[in-house]
């Protein structure tokens, strides 16, 4: 069962927008990439890569922490997330719903 199948309508629209944008940029869409995108969209707080990794690991046991970081890097480069540097040297991530298409 895929994580994003439980998104509410607003989150589903945002999810589809992100995935479509990545496809248009010829960025490979993997199940773990979709899971990270859905996680960020659904998150009410600002998760760290480690938090995302630990929460998704039970459903994606072959996923590595590096995979999460790589996916966050792509989402950051494409303008879908922002990095938030915390005082304790932790970096957390926040979704950007107002993403504009930049081609």
What are these regions (language model features)?
Residues 1-26:
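N-terminal leader segment of winged-helix/HTH proteins
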Residues 29-31:
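Short helix-coil-helix linker/hinge
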Residues 34-39:
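Pre-recognition alpha-helix immediately N-terminal to the DNA-recognition helix
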Residues 43-48:
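Short capping segments at the starts of secondary-structure elements
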Residues 51-57:
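A short acidic, leucine-rich amphipathic alpha-helix
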Residues 64-65:
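Short coil turns linking two alpha-helices in DNA-binding domains
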Residues 68-78:
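Basic amphipathic alpha-helical segments that dock to polyanions
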Residues 77-103:
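Non-DNA-binding regulatory cores of transcription-related proteins
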């Amino acid at each position: 069962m895929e994580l994003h199948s439980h998104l509410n309508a607003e989150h589903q629209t945002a999810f589809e927008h992100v995935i479509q944008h990545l496809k248009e940029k010829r960025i490979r869409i993997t199940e773990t990439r979709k899971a990270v995108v859905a996680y960020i969209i659904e998150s009410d707080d600002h998760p760290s890569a480690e938090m995302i990794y630990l929460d998704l690991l039970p459903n994606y046991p072959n996923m590595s922490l590096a995979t999460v970081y790589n996916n966050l890097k792509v989402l950051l480069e494409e303008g879908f997330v922002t990095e938030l540097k915390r005082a304790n040297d932790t970096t957390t991530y926040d979704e950007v719903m107002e993403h504009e298409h930049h081609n």
